Amino acid sequence: MPSKKVAKEPKSVSDGARVLEQLKAENIRWVELFYTDVFGGYNQVDVPLASLDEESFVSGVPKLDGSSVRGFREIFESDMLLVPDIRTLATIPWNPGAGGTVRFICDVRIGGTKAPYDHDPRWVARRTEQVLADAGFDHSYWGPEIEFWVFDSVQLVPSFQGVHDAWAGAGYQINHSEAPWQVGASQPPIRFKEGYHRTAPTDSLVGLRAEMCNILADQFHVVMDAHHHEVATASQSEINVRYDELVPMGDHIQDVRYVIKNVAHQHGKVGCLMPKPVYGDNAIGMHTNQSLWTKDKNAFYDANDKYAEVSQTCRYYVGGLMKHSRALCAITNPTTNSYRRLVPGYEAPVFIAWSRANRSASIRIPAYHRGRPTVKRVEYRTPDSAANIYLTEAALALAGLDGIKKKIEPPAPVNENIYKLSPERRRELEIRELPGSLGEALDCLDSDHAFLRPAFAPSLIETYIELKREEQLELNLRPHPYEFYRYLDV
């Protein structure tokens, strides 16, 4: 893999001047400044190119009210800065009416001091890169496999307002031409769990995914690996991005999510990253591949290991992931809906175990090839596409690093279908279960977060848990339509 320097705070005034001259020469009129909130949402403010100068790329643009962003600042301390990262320059292709438009991803700084803001997920990721470097790992490489849906339409019935009514709830209706429940479709449907690698015309999204990937490559400079239909019906898809280091990969995945939603919208469809919208079929995940490197050597590879060609460092890293897996779920699986995915029978992890080439384990060592150190990696299969990618990568890296520092030896790998093991056999193999709800995951994070402290501020963890508990409570307080079906006659 190519050698890269650890990502540091970018830029100089001269770099900013060069970029501004380039944009002026291209007749760019508007600049979109993007940043990520605590829960992974992309946010933007648009400014005229003429309002920026060279200093904007060093000192920041004063266009952020931190009190208006969930999980950021209080109203009495809310002046914040957006510092554009010139390495993230991209062209926005769907704003022709605005003239030429470009985008920069920004770091968030505190107004007055210009200090990095420790609730900025991108800063947490950048800090984690430094923690890894301090531990002797010059590079870490990441390859999340992002899955998603593109529905023809989604309605809440009778309306979105119904979810807030005290006297009436809202049902939902998903429409897609591939779905077996769709009336009047022109093609045979994709039956539940029979969508994997289907071809056109059964796969109705080949062209749409290609358009997404082309835009990502051409306008957002993201190197693509593959795209395909996934297992579930009703449009379930996957896009694979070429591996990259921690912060750049976070940027890439944010852009993938953004492009999915916007290209779908351009075609009158709904791009969706909700893990489990379709009952009875597979949900979407975000299996996250990762490896640590010292100079140009993969620290996870050992040619002498007969089981999976993994080093002792890799085993300790896996041990750290396994020790903290239940706490990690609060970050890697951050919604109440996430736990409708983590159930038996739908190819999603339920039990904490590691193995070679075993997709029933939560941690898999891919075994496509032997004797190839550059591709040796750990695949952590628990995350889903609703997760904040910066915090997910950072938390996984810190959990694994904790395992390395403390020499946490994982249990023996499990070379059986874990879904079919008896409870007694699972206990014998020291297999624990992942949390069954967001509330349970938050309890685990509340009691196990010391491993995150090298990069996660205590206030960030406290804020995250507090606001996520509010989400869980909001759902728990509301009667569910299925409860009326099940209990109206009790």
Model regions and ranges:
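Glycine-rich, acidic/polar active-site loops that bind/position phosphate-bearing ligands
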Residues: 2-490
